[in-house]
Amino acid sequence: MIEELDVHGLSVAEARSLIDKALKSLKKETCVLRIIHGYSHGDAIGKMVRSRYRKHPKIQRVELSMNRGITDLIIRRIL
């Protein structure tokens, strides 16, 4: 299941807080957390997402979308 989180228009700190909360409360079925951060007003949130969550323990990998305003966080499955 893909969960979407729209953070564009927020500050980097606000976006980080919402993403952290979303990661803490993921549903068991969720395999992708899709972050909609936008890009037309700068890419500060996108850059933060790609750097901060690349090494997060719940994230297997970070995938860039064909849409520059979206980054997918692929959730690590614990067996």
Pin down the residues of each PLM region.
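Long, charged, low-complexity intrinsically disordered regions
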Residues: 1-79
